Amino acid sequence: KYMRVVGPKSAEFFNQGVNNSEEYAYWMKNVMPYVKDQAGNKRTARLKDLSYNWDNSEGPKKYVEFTTIRLNPGEGRDWFTMMRNDAKLKKANGFTGIRGVFWLVSGGQSEMHVVEPYDSHGVRKGVFSDPDFDYNDSYNEMFGWRARTYDQMNAGMSIRDYGGQFTETLEFIPEMSTSIE
């Protein structure tokens, strides 16, 4: 499976279109003849309150854990609450990992993408500044008694039963990439 990511771009970039660009001509001539299935364009927008340590000026990492979440219609609030609380706690306690949470603006059914880039398998995707940090206790102190258990349970129930969550590991291949400029 191959995924082409064009980002970060503004809405104006998409308004101008790319059909007449050199990149598009190259893509059509050298890549599209080998594409078996094309899912089409999907546009996403990052939810800053649910993300942490995301910096558009940094170059890409070697790998990305890419999780797709499909929420039950009308029941996503609990999932958003847990993700927002998790991000708030990690930001407040010096967590070094990176997470971007994106919602699908157009190009498919309603879904969220949780993107966690990293450079090496077998290495934690972030640590807290205090090595003795207790995540569960700190979560409950920040958001209320037994909040972690309650939030986790309700967030899980917000996700569709069938095909509601799946995770893929993506690999960045520089030879197949262009600049983010």
Put a short name on every predicted segment.
Residues K1-E181:
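Short S/T/G/P-rich N-terminal loop/turn motif that feeds into the first structured element of a domain
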